[in-house]
Each structure stands twice: as structure tokens, then as C-alpha cells.
Amino acid sequence: QQEQENLEKQSENKKDTLTTDYYKIYYLDGRVESVDTSLNIYKDYKFNFLRQDSFEFLEMPNVGSSYNKLGYTFNNRIDYPKLGFRGKHFHYYEAEDIGYYEVPTPFTEIFAKSSFEQGQILDAVISINLSQELNFTLAHKGYKSLGKYVNTRTRGNQFRFSTNFNSKNKKSKLKFHITSQNMFNQESGGLSPDGIYFFEQAPNYFVLDNFGNQIENEDGSFEMIEYDGYLDRSRLPSRLLAESSLYSKRVFADFNRSLIYNNEKETSILSLGLQFKHEYKKLEYNDPYTSALFGEVEEGILVSDQSRYILQKNVIYLVSDFNKFGKLKVDYSLINSNNTYKDYDGNLSGLIFNLENKQSNFSSKWIKDFSFFKIELNINKSLKEEMVSNYTSITFKTDKIKNIEIKLNALSAEKSPNLNHVFFRSAYKNYNWYNSNLENQKSSSLSAELSFKELIKISGEYSIIDNYIFFRESTNALNGEIDNFRKVDVNQINSQINYFKIKLFSKVDFGKFSFINTGQ
């Protein structure tokens, strides 16, 4: 009887034991992650506003602001040129960033952290499976921070709701999400010339009495205040007292139905899918004091630039999975975009304020597992000449052989400029352009990665870029006084750019301690 009771207890323990492997997160690109509840140095790398390793990013003086990038990669694949305004999108949740959960018990994750000067960040995720087939996930990120300097306050709310559904017979799948994001920033434009002087020099000040006279000490010297600009940054004057914001809503759905299903292996051999995305963005820039930093403003206009962007994408795709031939996905997409700027009630005459584009894409993805390695091929072809995004990418990855793993990738891509490179409208006279003659940017990239256990990982990338497009400050900015005025132009380099970077990661264990280094 005692032995039977022990067996029953062991059976109950096995039944009730759940590891983190049961808590899964699915992404659109096919990635599957398990919830990680461990405490390690990698978690500390991600314990920041972005919730990711910010190794290549240089932070601004406040959270929720933009970042300076210290490294670039040119092997990204996109199916449609972006809106632009990339400084506003570092912490923006794209459709590919949304996770679809599958959890055996209710799951909660809460991230909380204080920030600069009376600031807080809270990011909470609550996920629950109402049944084995249906999951609902609610997530919200809210933040506010005053910042160290004048007029650098930030605040934002980023709401995400996702649903993951798999039918009981596993022949139908649905991924659905809704996002609502609102990000607000005060824009200081950096320190004014006086602010820079006080910041660098930190001069001392004489103390004056009520009549404006200097106060004399007993030794004959005058009483002074020692001022340290580094410790009192909130008093340093800035160039601007402006505000900017990005507001966005998105609805996304991906439905997949198996046409031929292998019941023995519980895998789909042939399936048909439909995907829909509707995204709306509203960008605003308000300068009630009409700063002269960006030049002259149209007469009688209060600076309140506004932009509206609508993107709608419809995709139909077919997926086949045969052991001998690998997994093949073929899709056809229709994309419509509309970008509209405020016309200030017709005061900006002779300019267009609306740009509408349509594009059709044909793309394919092939994955094949061999004995010791895997090959992945991605191709995308735009069928129209405007708003082009063409690429061909091939990836070769080996299995771990004697703890050594190798990954190689080659990419050739061509894409049209971002929309704000082509088209922009503002109350500032110098910030209105329509560049219809920009060439498509072309790039060829080769990357490699070699890793041995967790001891060392070396990765490198070599890229050749033609017709690179970027924003550059004009050398003859307005009156030539670079310190007082800013004029930015869209620039395209006709010559070729060669870009190379190499990154080294190493981890050495000493008992329960680890020594980790990353260099680039």
C-alpha cells in the first residue's frame, strides 16, 4: 500500500509539473520562443526602455526619445518602402514585433523601472488560454519622464491585444492583433549658445543685494555663488520650445487553412492563407513660439505641421511542406498607401499635399533541411516601377558539429526611398520638397557568423551600397551661421559605399561567475 501511494504521488507530481517550455510565443516570421524566467546577465542587457539589447544605440538625455545608431545593417528584407521619420520608431511596435501566446496557465509579466527626473516606465503583459485552442493576450506599456534638460519631457501609451487560435483538428489557424500607440515628445533642439557656454564653463556669479549692489565679505572680497552647469542642467536654456507626437492604430489578421493534412504526423502538407493589415499614423509638430532655428515661416501661419499616413495590405499565400522538397511559401500582395500633409487652409499655394501609391508584390520562401545543414531562400519582386522593394536572399546554416555552428547569408536588394525623402510639407519655407527624381537605393550584402558553444561568437557583415539616400545638414545653412540656423536637405550619393563591421562576443565561466564581453 505504501508503494502504491508513492507511485500515485509521483504520477501527480509529473502531471502537475509545468516547465517554461510549455509557455510559447509565436511570431509572424516563424520564430517560436519560450518564456524565460531565469535571471542572468542577458536579462540585464534588456532591462531598459526598449526591452532589448541596446549595444549599438546611443541614448538621448531622456527615455522615449530617439537614439543615435553606432552600427548599421543592410541585410534587412522589407516588402514596401517605409514612411520615414525613423527617429520616432525606435520603440514603435511593428506588426512583426507582436507575439501570439500559448500558455497552459494564466501568464503575467510586469516590467517596471524609474527613469529620469520624476519618471516611470511600466510594461505589463497578461495572457490566458480560455481553452487549449484559444488564447487572448493584453499588453500595455506606459511611460512618462521629465528629463534632465529643459523641454525634454516624454510620455506615451502603447496598447497591444492579440489572439492566437488553433482549431481542434489543427487544420485552421488565426493570428489577430490590434495596437494603439501614442508617443509624445517635447523638442528642445539642443542647448542654446548660452546654454552651451554655461554647461562648459560653469562660471561663478556675484551675489547682489536688494538694491543690485555686490555684497562685500569681511575680508574685502565679494560674495559669490559657485555654479556647476553639469549638476544643474534643468536651468540651461534650449533652442526650441516645441512638441511632436506620433499616434497610430493598426488592425492585423492572418488566417491559414490546411487543404491537405497528414493526420499521422499532425502536419499540414498544403495550406491556403489570407493576411490583412490596416495601419493609420498621425504625426504632428507644433511650435507655438515659431522659433527661427529652421528659418522663415510663411506669413500669418502658426507652425502646426501635420501628416496622415494610411497603409493597407492584402496578401493571399499558399504553403506546401513536403519532406523531399522542403517547405515552400508563395504569396501575392496588394499594397495601398496614402500620405497627406496639412495645407494650412490653402496658405501654402502651388504645392501638392497628397501622395497616393499602389504596389503589387510577388514573393516566395523556400526552406530545406538536409543532413547537417539548412538552406533558406527568399525572393520578393515588385510588379510596378514606383515604391519598389526587390530582394533575393539566401541563408546557409549548419547544425552543431563538435559544438561549432556556422551561418552564412547573401542578399541583393533594391528599394525606393522612404516617403519623407520624396515628399514633405511644412510651414517652414525651407522644409518643403518633392523629389521625384531620386534613384532606387541598391545594396549587396554578405554576412557570416561562427560560434563555438557559448564561449565565443564572431559575426561580420560586408555591404556595398549604391545611390544611398540620407538627410544632411546644408553646408551653407541659410545665412551661413551654422550655430544659429539648421537647414536639412535630402541627399543622394552617386558613388558607391563600402561598409564593413565585425562583432565579437565571448563568455568565460569561473564557477558560478561568468565574464562576458562584446566588442564591435
Regions found by a protein language model. Name each.
Residues Y101-V150, T154-F159, N169-S172:
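Outer-membrane beta-barrel translocator/receptor signature
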Residues Q1-Q4, G326:
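Bacterial Sec-dependent N-terminal signal peptides
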Residues E3-P104:
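Acidic, small-polar-rich N-terminal luminal/periplasmic segments of exported/outer-membrane proteins
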Residues E94, I121-A124, S238-R239, L302, ...:
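Short structured motifs
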Residues S54-L58, L146-Q158, S162-Y247, K397-L455, ...:
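Outer-membrane beta-barrel translocator/channel fold
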Residues N169-I301, R308-N336:
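Outer-membrane beta-barrel domain signature, strongest for Gram-negative TonB-dependent receptors
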Residues I78, V103-T105, L246-Y289, V303-Q520:
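Exposed, low-structure sequence patches enriched in small/polar residues
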Residues S115, S131, A139-S145, T179-Q181, ...:
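An acidic- and aromatic-residue-enriched active-site/binding cleft used to recognize and process polar
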